[in-house]
From Swiss-Prot:
Cross-referenced NCBIfam families: PRK05327.1, rpsD_bact
Organism expressing this protein natively: Caldicellulosiruptor saccharolyticus (strain ATCC 43494 / DSM 8903 / Tp8T 6331)
GO biological process: ribosomal small subunit biogenesis; translation
Protein name per its UniProtKB record: Small ribosomal subunit protein uS4
GO molecular function, one term: rRNA binding
Domain named S4 RNA-binding: residues: 98-163
Gene Ontology annotations for the cellular component aspect, listed alphabetically: small ribosomal subunit
Gene3D superfamilies reported for this sequence: Ribosomal Protein S4 Delta 41, Chain A, domain 1, RNA-binding S4 domain
UniProt keyword rRNA-binding, yes or no: yes
Length: 208
């Protein structure tokens, strides 16, 4: 599947929920989903009843879009999840949460996962003292994530510190908002993921 390059707000409308892809805009009256909470297109308001396969596919697409992952990589995460101890669906979500771009977002060091992905790619972050510019890098317990010292003085990071860094982070992360430093103190569990995701549908889809 190729990368989607259209408006992010159309994806929220397609999935029938806010995916929080646009940062601040998602919390304002400008949010397209808040104005039109139905799929885009001429017949968008005429929601059709999905088949079992349709519901499974829709759930997979939703999760891929939340985390900004394409099909090949998403399938690879699922294969990893199946080999891990525990429940495959919950393992899958835990792996996605451990992506560096997601962790940066969860720490409040970016307004959205999309911005976090860009900032990581532009080498603004260190993990355990070393620069990491791979958004899909999987963090582990004990890892320390920080904004590079020379990046902290950039206007965008000054704004991030003022607007986002002090927002609450999940319990598996701890942070020093003043210095833009975070640490992984546990692996994320299903209870830590507050989004309405039906991961069992994804497991059923890939198990066919």
């Amino acid at each position: 599947m190729s990368k989607y390059i259209g408006p992010d707000c159309r994806l929220c409308r397609r999935e029938g929920m806010k995916l929080f892809l646009k940062g601040d805009r998602c919390y304002t009256e400008k949010c397209a989903f808040a104005k039109r909470p139905y799929p885009p297109g001429q017949h968008g308001q005429e929601r059709k009843k999905l088949s079992e396969y349709g519901m499974q596919l829709r759930e997979k697409q939703k999760v891929k879009r939340i985390y900004g992952v394409l099909e090949t990589q998403f399938r690879r995460y699922f294969e990893m999840a199946e080999k891990m101890k525990g429940i495959a669906g919950e393992n899958l979500l835990s792996l996605l949460e451990r992506r560096l771009d997601n962790v940066v977002y969860r720490l409040g060091f970016a307004s959205s996962r999309g911005e976090a992905r860009v900032l990581v790619s532009h080498a603004h972050f260190k993990v355990n003292g070393k620069t990491v510019n791979i958004p899909s890098y999987l963090v582990d317990v004990g890892d320390v994530i920080e904004v590079k010292e020379k990046s902290k003085s950039k206007p965008r990071f000054i704004e991030i510190k003022e607007k986002y860094a002090k927002r609450p982070s999940p319990k598996w992360l701890e942070k020093d908002a003043e210095n833009l430093v975070g640490k992984v103190i546990a692996l994320p569990t299903r209870e830590d993921i507050d989004m309405p995701i039906k991961e069992h549908l994804i497991v059923e889809l890939y198990s066919k």
